[in-house]
Regions:
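Interaction-surface and assembly-scaffold signal
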Residues: 71-122
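Auxiliary, metal-adjacent structural segments of Zn-dependent hydrolase domains
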Residues: 116-173
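Long, well-structured alpha-helical subdomains associated
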Residues: 218-276
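Acidic, His- and aromatic-enriched active-site or binding-groove loops in soluble protein domains
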Residues: 173-188
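Post-HEXXH active-site segment of zinc metalloproteases
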Residues: 206-224
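Active-site recognition of the HExxH zinc-binding catalytic motif
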Residues: 190-210
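Short, flexible loop/turn elements at secondary-structure junctions
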Residues: 161-163, 182-186, 201
Length: 276
């Protein structure tokens, strides 16, 4: 399967730096990366916290459907200057977004860079002995679901030391980029593998909604519900021994909510897709 898909696993300190700063902004939606325990721990270890202006944080929350691109460009850029140029050229963010959010946000990123990079390099060294097992676990998981991951010619997984909550996926001409938490133990390895499956399901099921998917109109919730149920059907068919673990990971209450929210014919369609 690996030969067919082309799996590449990397570590990207600039993306981790950006997500370190994002982890300090409460968002209150499905893309929220805020983690109070992480914020406290990193303040103790670095002796500082990002100085994000509250007005910039408010702009991020209020205009998230436009400025969310800020969480994806770091995967394919190597620094702030390149990232800002990519954001300006994207056509998604206007000058007001740049002035009120992107520029003050990236000033905070640059102020954190030296302290964070020193911490990151130390973390890389500390986790060196766990990397082979973590990477092998992802490769084996992809082989297990070979028919599913065969939808992708190339997958690049960035394992992150900063990501605390929700994974990310970004499609570009170079293939699929996934941003996943580096697993600290076996339970974390299961979480990372299931997050990989979750993120890779979105491009298959999201088009079935037939419109732009946004946070502010509820369509993102429906997109998530589709993924919840598709993956449940897929795991039941391909790896039934993981089914209860998956249900606990998603949350059984969320699976029930998905079944209530989606029409029976849509649920049947998702089951049929997962069985192809």
């Amino acid at each position: 399967m690996e030969e067919k898909t082309g799996l590449n696993i990397i570590y990207q300190r600039y993306a981790d730096l950006v997500y370190h700063v994002l982890a300090h902004i409460p968002l209150d939606n499905a893309a929220d990366e805020y983690d109070a325990e992480y914020v406290r721990t990193m303040r103790e270890q670095l002796g500082r916290s990002p100085a994000i202006p509250e007005k910039a944080a408010e702009w991020y929350r209020e205009h998230f459907d436009r400025v969310c691109l800020i969480g994806f460009m770091p995967f394919v850029t190597g620094g702030t200057e390149e990232c800002l140029a990519a954001l300006r050229g994207s056509g998604m963010m206007d000058e007001a977004d740049m002035e009120h959010f992107a520029l003050p946000f990236f000033r905070a990123v640059e102020e954190e860079k030296d302290a964070y990079y020193a911490w990151w390099e130390k973390k890389q060294a500390e986790t060196e002995d766990r990397k082979p097992g973590a990477e092998a676990g992802l490769r084996e998981f992809i082989r297990r679901f070979d028919g599913f991951f065969g939808h992708y010619d190339r997958i690049t997984v960035i394992l992150s030391h900063s990501l605390q909550r929700n994974g990310r996926m970004f499609m570009n001409p170079g293939g699929a980029f996934l941003y996943l938490k580096f697993p600290g133990n076996e339970a974390g390895m299961e979480d990372t593998r299931l997050q990989l499956l979750h993120e890779c399901t979105h491009p298959l099921t999201d088009p079935k909604l037939g419109n732009d998917i946004r946070m502010d109109d509820g369509s993102h919730d429906l997109a998530e519900y589709q993924v919840f149920l598709y993956d449940e059907f897929l795991i039941e068919r391909k790896a039934p021994e993981l089914l209860e673990r998956y249900r606990d990971w998603i949350g059984r209450e969320w699976l029930e909510e998905a079944r209530r929210a989606l029409a029976p014919e849509r649920t049947a369609m998702l089951k049929e897709m997962a069985c192809e």
